[in-house]
Amino acid sequence: MYRAAASLASKARQAGNSLATRQVGSRLAWSRNYAAKDIKFGVEARALMLRGVEELADAVKVTMGPKGRNVVIEQSFGAPKVTKDGVTVAKSIEFKDRVKNVGASLVKQVANATNDTAGDGTTCATVLTKAIFTEGCKSVAAGMNAMDLRRGISMAVDAVVTNLKGMARMISTSEEIAQVGTISANGEREIGELIAKAMEKVGKEGVITIADGNTLYNELEVVEGMKLDRGYISPYFITNSKTQKCELEDPLILIHDKKVTNMHAVVKVLEMALKKQKPLLIVAEDVESEALGTLIINKLRAGIKVCAVKAPGFGENRKANLQDLAILTGGEVITEELGMNLENFEPHMLGTCKKVTVSKDDTVILDGAGDKKSIEERAEQIRSAIENSTSDYDKEKLQERLAKLSGGVAVLKIGGASEAEVGEKKDRVTDALNATKAAVEEGIVPGGGVALLYASKELDKLQTANFDQKIGVQIIQNALKTPVHTIASNAGVEGAVVVGKLLEQENTDLGYDAAKGEYVDMVKTGIIDPLKVIRTALVDAASVSSLMTTTESIIVEIPKEEAPAPAMGGGMGGMDY
């Protein structure tokens, strides 16, 4: 009996040990799924973050102004990239130190936000972010209240934006548009004039795209086309990973006014596209469930170039937009109102065009195959509807449709002697085009950073609730001097001297022409900046840098140490020669 009890106890211990081993093993397996974290606090955290901000900003700021330098960026494949575009430089920088990288990533966020909103001004935003955060760190280290500093910064930015809006003037002439484009293209007059011509051809609200040219020279080509303000439904449809766009050459275009959910509804049109060896674009109210899955699987596994886009607009406006698209591409709208559906449509109901480019936000259809006479008749119907309409909203929508149907698309073809040169010029043309659109939208202010410099003088009058908020205002006041300082320094002149001389006089149009090395009337000379670009750069920079100033701890992953590779085994015996 004793032996039986001992045997049972032994088995229980073994079972317990086995269970404990399994529990420890499961805990180890669970912990392996989570990386260890490192936490930095207070001054140390902000100092490390500041180092990342400063190093990134120093790399970006060398591109600023007419005498700014190029930056050469190593790429994982192909030749190095040469650029003067601030956001391109910022995006390329990664630090080994995780905390430094947090600071750099937040500056990249500023540059990206400014680029997305205004299309230009990324270098200015980066320089301002560094200036505000540097002063903010010093103030917090000296014992200032971080939240009061942030309130002061916010008050100062609001006051400066109001001042800039009062300083702005609208532009309208082709010459003024060319001046804005020239400044944003780093003084290349040819690019400014090319953009002005493109806007003249398709209107200020028209669609202008940028493409690689086939010659040494820049060219302007106007192609009849239409832009839809809807992008691809799924990123799986992307065909160009570099531009994050789906590009389809000579596609079949299916236009449907209802949702597409059934797999069988898209199989027929996919087979048709495969048979004709052509890409496929589907424009419908929506594509979801089985239908969307079928399209994605055929794109990924069968290699069929396909893309689905939601139809633009709502209700009757959507139907009208689809009808416009059908006439432009020579197809028909497959609608149940006329007894048609996706199971019984005929091949002649599909439209086509020369090229379709789909981004996450919009779709550009170039050179539709529709009958010219039908397109002109449709445009005339819209013009008549505009004349007869009494609603401002309806008129606006009708004018949008008319512009899309008959305005066309201007293509700026950028030429050069090498791929690197074309890439660098395309970066500058993109900045110039975005800046020009921003200038037309909100107006212009004197360029070269002087608008911000003169706005800083107005902050002397700003009333604050306490001393710490006053310091926040002074941080912005000092930061607003950095764009002029940086542009002058890049031109080989003492920046502090230029800033001091400009602040001494009262003419708010006077500035420093870094290209010629003289003080001039910036507006008369054509050195101007779009208000939207300057405003967005300041607001984004102040927002992120003031948040960084209030940071008290940073949590980052501790990099895993890779185990060394095992040594190679010995050779087989008898293999010596």
UniProtKB/Swiss-Prot annotation:
PROSITE patterns: CHAPERONINS_CPN60. Keywords: ATP-binding, Chaperone, Mitochondrion, Nucleotide-binding, Stress response, Transit peptide. It comes from the Eukaryota. Its main location: mitochondrion. Induction: By heat shock. It is found in: Mitochondrion. One of its GO terms (molecular function) is ATP-dependent protein folding chaperone. GO terms for biological process: protein folding; protein refolding. CDD domains: GroEL (cd03344). Belongs to the chaperonin (HSP60) family. Implicated in mitochondrial protein import and macromolecular assembly. May facilitate the correct folding of imported proteins. May also prevent misfolding and promote the refolding and proper assembly of unfolded polypeptides generated under stress conditions in the mitochondrial matrix. PANTHER family: 60 KDA HEAT SHOCK PROTEIN, MITOCHONDRIAL. This is Chaperonin CPN60-1, mitochondrial.
